[in-house]
Amino acid sequence: MSIKVIVAGFKGRMGSTAVEMVKGDDELTLAALLDPFAAEKEVDGVPVFTDKADLVGFDADVWVDFTIPAVAYENTRFALENGFAPVVGTTGFTEAQIQKLTDLSKDKSIGGLIAPNFAIGAILLMKFAAEASKYFPDLEIIELHHDKKKDAPSGTAVKTAELIREVRESKRQGAEDEMETLAGARGAEFDGFRIHSVRLPGLVAHQEVIFGAQGEGLTLRHDSYDRISFMSGVNLGIKEVVKRDQLVYGLEHLL
């Protein structure tokens, strides 16, 4: 039976790409579109909504969310409360918010996914970086995105850092008497290492994890050159969350 999908944020770049992915899969049905800036009432016969409250009682299985950090938490909570399994690519969630949504999903016995990155290569980078940090504990993360991205550092960088923290012995890097002559020059501090954010036009989504040791170095890098790179992960998420009864944070839990 076809999985009925709502796409929230369909006017955006990621949302519009997700719409095309859903339309191109015979196992999925595009049930509704949501965006507060939409002027049209329907697109190719699919109803368009500007207020999520109008979707209460709507017949759908999955809520795909590519909106903005300011509304993503409320959208995800709304989806769970109304029986839609959320697949969320919007970043900016706090640990407390993720825990609240996980608890709500358990109460409702509804599956869900919040993923900082849907590209399979990016997930592999996270795993490889965590493994490497056991042997190269001195490291820095550099993430690079388009200049319209609102949050920094990226959710992918934060998730990578969290996975590294789980296995790396905590240590403070750099000189003890290190001094920034320009505030922020060393980037954001996380568990003793640094995260740097680059925002430039022409970029999509890129990340490096640079490791240093005596006499050697190791660099891991992933590049998304086009948003289509995320769609295999979104597709997987849609098809997996309907089988589950709890929300998870990170696509790696579904691989």
UniProtKB/Swiss-Prot annotation:
The keyword Chloroplast does not apply. It comes from the Bacteria. The keyword Oxidoreductase applies. Coiled coil: none annotated. GO terms for molecular function: 4-hydroxy-tetrahydrodipicolinate reductase; NAD binding; NADP binding; oxidoreductase activity, acting on CH or CH2 groups, NAD or NADP as acceptor. Pathway: Amino-acid biosynthesis; L-lysine biosynthesis via DAP pathway; (S)-tetrahydrodipicolinate from L-aspartate: step 4/4. InterPro entries: DapB_C, DapB_N, DapB_N_CS, DHDPR_bac, NAD(P)-bd_dom_sf. (S)-2,3,4,5-tetrahydrodipicolinate binds at H146, G155, T156. Its EC number is 1.17.1.8. It catalyses: (S)-2,3,4,5-tetrahydrodipicolinate + NAD(+) + H2O = (2S,4S)-4-hydroxy-2,3,4,5-tetrahydrodipicolinate + NADH + H(+); (S)-2,3,4,5-tetrahydrodipicolinate + NADP(+) + H2O = (2S,4S)-4-hydroxy-2,3,4,5-tetrahydrodipicolinate + NADPH + H(+). Keywords: Amino-acid biosynthesis, Cytoplasm, Diaminopimelate biosynthesis, Lysine biosynthesis, NAD, NADP, Oxidoreductase. Gene3D superfamilies: Dihydrodipicolinate Reductase, domain 2, NAD(P)-binding Rossmann-like Domain. It is found in: Cytoplasm. NAD(+) binds at G9, F10, K11, G12, R13, M14, G89, T90, T91, A115, P116, N117, F118. The active site is at H145 (proton donor/acceptor), K149 (proton donor). One of its GO terms (cellular component) is cytosol. Transmembrane segments: none annotated. It is an enzyme of class 1 (oxidoreductase). Its main location: cytoplasm. GO terms for biological process: diaminopimelate biosynthetic process; lysine biosynthetic process via diaminopimelate. Catalyzes the conversion of 4-hydroxy-tetrahydrodipicolinate (HTPA) to tetrahydrodipicolinate. NCBIfam families: dapB. Belongs to the DapB family. HAMAP family: DapB. This is 4-hydroxy-tetrahydrodipicolinate reductase. It comes from Streptococcus thermophilus (strain ATCC BAA-250 / LMG 18311).
